[in-house]
Amino acid sequence: MDPTIAAGALIGGGLIMAGGAIGAGIGDGIAGNALIAGIARQPEAQGRLFTPFFITVGLVEAAYFINLAFMALFVFATPVA
């Protein structure tokens, strides 16, 4: 394999993982902030707030794992020159 293609694949894969990790961290932080603010405002609504929070965090983490799959595609399925 051409070293330029391999280097580009590894750099692209690293950028994909970095963007996914940063995005997932920001998304989880925003969701957690909203949960804490909602519980602080209405403590009796804590039970109703946890379900949408966990669904949101699950969707954010699913997007991260989709990024992981694309990274694996770019790094391990690069064309052979």
Curated annotation (Swiss-Prot):
It is a multi-pass membrane protein. The keyword Lipoprotein does not apply. The keyword Metal-binding does not apply. Its main location: membrane. GO terms for molecular function: lipid binding; proton-transporting ATP synthase activity, rotational mechanism. The chain crosses the membrane at residues 5-25, 57-77. Keywords: ATP synthesis, Cell membrane, CF(0), Hydrogen ion transport, Ion transport, Lipid-binding, Membrane, Transmembrane, Transmembrane helix, Transport. It is found in: Cell membrane. Belongs to the ATPase C chain family. F(1)F(0) ATP synthase produces ATP from ADP in the presence of a proton or sodium gradient. F-type ATPases consist of two structural domains, F(1) containing the extramembraneous catalytic core and F(0) containing the membrane proton channel, linked together by a central stalk and a peripheral stalk. During catalysis, ATP synthesis in the catalytic domain of F(1) is coupled via a rotary mechanism of the central stalk subunits to proton translocation. Key component of the F(0) channel; it plays a direct role in translocation across the membrane. A homomeric c-ring of between 10-14 subunits forms the central stalk rotor element with the F(1) delta and epsilon subunits. This is ATP synthase subunit c. It comes from Mycobacterium sp. (strain KMS).
